[in-house]
């Protein structure tokens, strides 16, 4: 009976431990910050392409 409180405390500590990322990082691993930067830069690039040739996208190469 004396071991039960210790056992419960250990279970609570194990459950509150931070999780570990199981998947290994690969070569094309992108962080959230780089994805946010990419999302911000893409509309800027598209707006520059639109401004270079309003009639046709063929001349924007």
Swiss-Prot record:
Q: Which InterPro entries match?
A: T-conotoxin
Q: Name one GO molecular function term.
A: toxin activity
Q: How is it modified after translation?
A: Contains 2 disulfide bonds that can be either 'C1-C3, C2-C4' or 'C1-C4, C2-C3', since these disulfide connectivities have been observed for conotoxins with cysteine framework V (for examples, see AC P0DQQ7 and AC P81755).
Gene Ontology CC, one term: extracellular region
Q: Which UniProt keywords apply?
A: Disulfide bond, Neurotoxin, Secreted, Signal, Toxin
Q: Its domain of life? A: Eukaryota
Q: Which cysteines are joined by disulfide bonds?
A: none
Leader sequence range is 1-19
The compartments listed are: Secreted
Q: Which residues form the propeptide?
A: 20-50
Q: What is its main location?
A: secreted
Q: Where expressed (tissue)?
A: Expressed by the venom duct.
- Which family, according to the similarity comment? Belongs to the conotoxin T superfamily.
Q: Domain text from the record?
A: The cysteine framework is V (CC-CC).
The protein depicted here goes by the name Conotoxin Vn5.3
**Originating species:** Conus ventricosus (Mediterranean cone)
